[in-house]
Amino acid sequence: MQYNTLGNTDLRVSRLCLGCMTFGEPSRGNHAWTLPEESSRPIIKRTLEGGINFFDTANSYSDGSSEEIVGRALRDFARRDEVVVATKVFHRVGDLPEGLSRAQILRSIDDSLTRLGMEYVDILQIHRWDYTTPIEETLEALNDVVKAGKARYIGASSMHASQFAQALALQKQHGWAPFVTMQDHYNLIYREEEREMLPLCWQEGVAVIPWSPLARGRLTRPWGETTARLVSDDVGKNLYAESDKNDAQIAERLAGVSEALGATRAQVALAWLVSKRGVAAPIIGASREEQLDELLNAVDLTLKPEQIAELETPYKQHPVVGFK
């Protein structure tokens, strides 16, 4: 596994981050396809054995049970100073309403730390932009979380570049803790972040940690082939349904490049993303150990410029999706 420094922080992270939405009690939350604890623990253990030290979860994943499962596994399989743990706040969980008010942030971080069984998280991220709370209130509350030692850093996820620029400017103006990561929607078939968000992150030294790097499984198999999860994944359908025809052309080229390299589609799609400027660690998901082993090898795969061009050329502008 390769490692790099995460943006303007002192955190040394693996070039891949394990996304933990897959882990959670199926009876809790709105994802019936998640893995219960007994199935999640072997994957988390194998992740650590494979060199990944970066884990991303959220308060709302499976109504908090993702944090519980991940926290117990990391306590059993690793020392706290060996891992980098990120979680999120915004979405509704339990009786905590959706939003980023001061009260919601301060309660959410305490609840997350309790579920994780940790004294602090390395990164607390805002999951989405809150249109009902003044951004100054949100940013000051996040700063207070850092000052209290409950989070070492703060990050953001999926928003308009203009919103992110506004937040960064306010943090500078007030001397508040800055956002150090942007978790955005970025993969071979969704590259809208290249227009404004990625240049902003480069300029500000913000590390990019993309979600859905394999387009929720669409870049791992022949186009049109389905799985039980794809059939039941309403979020994925909303993200990619409108661009299906154009995306199929990219998937065909991905298959060709993969065959030429003797690699899998997933490995090539990840290698492409890892090669992009500013991308610190794509957030991968795995529901089986063999899936994880396949993805671990992607960071050692180097694409030639002509192969990158082959993959990128068919791309056409997409509707902005993943946030409002």
Feature annotation, model-predicted:
Residues M1-V83:
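N-terminal binding-site loop/beta-alpha segment at the start of enzyme catalytic domains
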Residues G24-E38, R92-L106, H127, T132:
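Active-site mouth loops of central-metabolism enzymes
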Residues S14-R15, R80-V83, T87, E119-I123, ...:
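Short acidic capping loops at alpha-helix termini that bridge into adjacent secondary structure
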Residues A73-E82, L113-G117, V146, L168-H174:
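Acidic (Asp/Glu)-rich catalytic clusters
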Residues L113-T133:
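Active-site groove signature of glycoside hydrolases
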Residues M21-F23, A58-S60, K88-R92, I126-W129, ...:
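Active-site beta-loop-alpha junctions enriched in small/polar residues
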Residues T133-T313:
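Beta/alpha (TIM)-barrel catalytic core signal, keyed to glycine-rich beta->alpha loops juxtaposed to Asp/Glu
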Residues W33-T47, L100-L116, F164-A169:
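Short, acidic/polar
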